């Protein structure tokens, strides 16, 4: 069975997902698209053929009988309504982050999905599908470094757009670490604090950059995450786990070391698309396979809710300067697998 997918949102990430379904993935095809920008819809249809039907709205696309599953890649504040509509129709839905713009919105989706009685939602957190993170998790699970005690992370971008704000360092950038570290350590967060080093001269006047986020898990693991979004030199994601008997560091992406002109160098990537392109392929293939096999296993609505709760605490800590406590709710049995 070829899964028939409708895509809501034909911007950069939506078009990229359509491309990978045609060029890279198997078991699915795009049968419907919609976007508030009609030109973007026309571009998708021109590039990928006349068999794709255009719809005037997301709800109309979701209700269409030929659409068996939905991809939500539209503007973030529209996500909650669209995901709830897909659940109401009993249709599996892959939703790019954010699942909802508030933790309360994520919880409403959790409740709707549980009331439906079957997992329908996969959230677009791609890092658990990255080969480097997976290798690091295998080392932790093997016991080779003993119990994790500390984690040192960095999330560095060369630059950001003018509209990027201090809060977005949490809600747009750190949110990926907040998700993947729960998965990596199999632990929940207990507290968060944000401290500000000397400010880079490359940051816009309204932006505090860099920032250091200090997290503690329920199990007592201490985590520090450097968020530096104007580092200039490249896109650089680092993660090192310090255990009782050893240290494990996530490998950098494979690149050809170069010796030339009396220098030894290794190239560094410049954007997130390059760094996680393979992970995007794997996560979307996992969604397709999960729908066809009637068992979704990727990042869930509950994972999105947990990340949103942690993000709220971090945003509060940005302004308070204090250690902000989090009450980690237990994962519902519905999401334990």
UniProtKB/Swiss-Prot annotation:
- The species this protein belongs to is Delftia acidovorans (strain DSM 14801 / SPH-1)
List the InterPro entries hit by this protein, alphabetically.
Gfo-Idh-MocA_inositol_DH (IPR050424), Gfo/Idh/MocA-like_OxRdtase_C (IPR004104), Gfo/Idh/MocA-like_OxRdtase_N (IPR000683), MI/DCI_dehydrogenase (IPR023794), NAD(P)-bd_dom_sf (IPR036291)
- One function term, GO molecular function aspect: inositol 2-dehydrogenase (NAD+) activity
Signal peptide (residue range) = none
Q: What does this protein do, in the record's words?
A: Involved in the oxidation of myo-inositol (MI) to 2-keto-myo-inositol (2KMI or 2-inosose).
| Complex formation | Homotetramer.
Name of the protein = Inositol 2-dehydrogenase
Question: What Enzyme Commission number(s) does the record list for this chain?
Answer: 1.1.1.18
Q: Which PANTHER family match?
A: INOSITOL 2-DEHYDROGENASE, PTHR43593
Its GO biological process annotations read: inositol catabolic process
Q: Which family does it belong to?
A: Belongs to the Gfo/Idh/MocA family.
- Known Pfam families for this protein? GFO_IDH_MocA, GFO_IDH_MocA_C
Keywords of the record, alphabetical order, are: NAD, Oxidoreductase
The reaction(s) annotated as catalysed by this protein in its Swiss-Prot or TrEMBL entry are: myo-inositol + NAD(+) = scyllo-inosose + NADH + H(+)
Q: Which Gene3D superfamilies match?
A: Dihydrodipicolinate Reductase, domain 2, NAD(P)-binding Rossmann-like Domain
Q: Please state what class of enzyme this protein is.
A: oxidoreductase
């Amino acid at each position: 069975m070829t899964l028939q997918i409708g895509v809501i949102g034909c911007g950069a990430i939506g078009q990229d997902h359509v491309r990978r379904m045609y060029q890279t993935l198997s078991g699915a095809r795009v049968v419907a698209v919609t976007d508030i920008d009609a030109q973007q819809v026309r571009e998708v249809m021109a590039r990928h053929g006349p068999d794709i039907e255009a719809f005037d709205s997301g709800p109309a696309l979701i209700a269409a009988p030929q659409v068996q599953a939905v991809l939500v890649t539209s503007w973030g504040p529209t996500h909650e309504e669209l995901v709830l509509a897909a659940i109401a129709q009993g249709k599996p839905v892959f939703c790019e982050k954010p699942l909802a713009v508030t933790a309360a919105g994520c919880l409403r989706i959790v409740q709707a999905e549980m009331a439906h009685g079957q997992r329908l939602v996969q959230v677009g957190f791609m890092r658990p599908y990255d080969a480097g993170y997976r290798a690091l998790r295998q080392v932790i699970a093997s016991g080779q470094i003993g119990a994790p005690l500390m984690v040192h992370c960095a999330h560095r971008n060369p630059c950001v757009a003018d509209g990027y704000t201090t809060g977005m360092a949490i809600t747009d950038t750190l949110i990926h670490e907040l998700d993947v570290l729960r998965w990596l350590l199999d632990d929940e967060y207990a507290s968060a604090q944000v401290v500000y080093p000397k400010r880079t001269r490359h940051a816009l006047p309204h932006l505090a950059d860099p920032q250091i986020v200090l997290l503690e898990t329920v199990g007592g693991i201490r985590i520090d995450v450097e968020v530096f979004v104007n580092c200039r030199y490249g896109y650089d994601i680092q993660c090192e786990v310090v255990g009782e008997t050893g240290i494990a560091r996530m490998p950098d992406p494979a690149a050809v070391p170069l010796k030339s002109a009396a220098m030894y160098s290794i190239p560094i990537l410049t954007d997130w698309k390059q760094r996680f392109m393979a992970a995007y392929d794997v996560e979307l293939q996992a969604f397709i396979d999960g729908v066809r096999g009637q068992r979704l296993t990727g990042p869930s609505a509950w994972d999105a809710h947990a990340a949103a709760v942690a993000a709220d605490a971090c945003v509060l800590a940005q302004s308070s300067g204090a250690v902000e406590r989090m009450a980690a709710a237990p994962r519902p049995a519905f999401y334990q697998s």
